[in-house]
């Protein structure tokens, strides 16, 4: 084992980039190759069936089961021509990942042979065993039945030899056991509420779509080095490891030249993603060494979220092909930036209007201000819930660490927009600033054209920032299912818009002019939600104190933060809009607490294992070597001379003894803390115990281990060090 580290390091240096050959010269030629998109629907479905299915997708018309057989037959024909042999209902249980069970297309033909068969019944509904998925107590282990139901709004796709059908997943009694079902309900709610408000400005609007553009950050580590780190393999992050002398302090990795092996991985990933209609647009080095980002063009939120879940699965598969392992954990390495997944969120109408973009007319700008302010109202009223929607054991390491947004939800608007809202709040005038277009900036360099400057700057410390025509929710973790944040955000905004319309209509009913009524309600809301607006430094201690004075949620304990889901305001909002009922919310919190506990529990067990089987033996071995050196020196020199010459070694022997003793004591205390926590029946209280008593002991043990790493001879250290994990590419 002592030599494994050096073997994998040597092997990593020998690896060369793999050749990646695109299936065609232009990406547009293979985009959507493995997706049953509209073009393929048109080709493989009868015309009347095609038109009915498009009506379902575009207008939310209920699916007529009578067309299911024809749709299934068309899908099967296309899939079989592509060499597909199996199908699966692909869904997103409360595990943060995806789930699937593969069934073959074959059935008996009644003559002793087999035929390929796929019916509408199999397409529309399946019965996966729900007993082994997280349910938060909604289902008992012996109550196995659950239903997966086809989501026609998200295209069917092919992975290898399997036809994957995006579905929702519900219990036998109808409660949602997944992320997609409540997401679809939240998107419907914001569509209804936003459309109603839109008609004050554009009576012709029939539908509002929620758009999402995610930015997926990740680390790549050589597979050999990964295999020599049990903590990475089992927890997704390093539980120990001293900082590399060089990490990200030179700012030379961000937007730097992409390493050749990584470039080959990215190219391969993009090809496979494009074949699945994932519109990858951007790739680049991130701030930390061996950290990267991939981002697509924005899409409708449900499809964008499916694509993100699909891409994360694809990344793991392609990384292994190229001799890497992809790390999606929010904080795989201490001392350098963690990974997030910025969610760029916006609303747009079926007539092509971006609702969070300023316009050229007073009507456009009044609409713009309305949707900005009501978004802020939703975020302000439910800022604790939004924090709960993005919180996890992994993301808790990243938030508030002077590298990511703080664990206090606030919104950055920029000076121009903030001044506009202040102007509206304090003025009785109906005229609005013209926010259209961009200002020009001349650089006085003849070869460089005039730059167009956005009307807002960027504030990287803001968790929820306005960026010109959308809001960027930056607190979402890299490993998360975006649906969690999107459910909370869209529901909160839907509630705010619904309440806004109710109050405006009440004023209109009293005879007030529509514009006057809108401005009166906006003035009231601008004043109400002002505490959520913050354009300063979110990392400062002053902001924490200021946020408390403003009444914002400043809780930092992950298990306690989850309580916000069960606040009366949250329950009332989710129930009134038909997103989730109290029972479903309680169940999801049980799952969140249980997941948090198990994450920390696994980390604690792995730390104990590595500590006692790697760290302590290596440290004591080096200590014995030092002791032998001292003994040998005393054989050669006088006692006085030997003591003088061996003073440093004696000091190291003593330090190793003290640190290993603290480590061994720490591991014993860690085990005992786990035992005490495990006896707690309440999932909430157990999670709090793991947060308060188990996690801190792991940090204490890590501190001692990281000090030993600097003492023990490098040749004896068995675990790949940060300099190797982060700089071998």
How would you name each of these model-derived features?
Residues 2-24, 141-157, 162:
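N-terminal hydrophobic targeting/anchoring segments and the immediately downstream early-domain regions
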Residues 67, 91, 119, 296-298, ...:
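Active-site proximal loops enriched in glycine and acidic residues that flank catalytic Cys/His/Asp
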Residues 524-729:
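C-terminal amphipathic alpha-helical interaction region
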